[in-house]
Amino acid sequence: VVVIVILGILAVVAMPKFLNLQRDARIADLKGAEGALKSANGIVYGKAAIKGVAEQEANDWNNSSDSTLLIDGKTVSLHYGYIIPTEGNIRAIMSMNKSDWSILSTGSRFGPAYIIPKSAPGFQTQSISEVEQSQCYLSYYFYKNGIINGKPVNYKVPVYKLETAGC
């Protein structure tokens, strides 16, 4: 009986520390993905500058420029030299395994795309609203226009946002 009581006390004391380690691991995964995506974007931007497409807006019905790069045999679409936030582009650049990372995107050339590690609460969902509610993801996007809250913003440069409150 004494052994069971001692084990129970140890479990109660150790469980919060174990849960914090899991949370820290999820946050570390997301920070690693953010760093890798920023680095990949830097390399892609350099290649886009060499090709002469770093100052071209993304292709759309209004713009027929070829703002794409062929990287490792895969065509990657760009917006001013940076990776457009779609699942296909991110997977092509990052080589993220589907069994370890979920990527959801809105389909817009401006994004956002949500990157979720396997251990996060929103990994299994296919709903962007559920991913946002999980509060454990990396979002990657461009501002759609040049003004946010009355202040000008640069719509040519991507935004990386870590949400870790739910991790």
Describe the residue ranges of each PLM region:
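Periplasmic/extracellular, small/polar-rich flexible segments of pilin-like filament-forming proteins
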Residues: 51-167
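Alpha-helix exit/C-cap motif
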Residues: 39-57
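N-terminal single-pass transmembrane signal-anchor helix
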Residues: 1-25, 29, 36
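Hydrophobic alpha-helical segments of small multi-pass membrane proteins
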Residues: 32, 36, 60-62
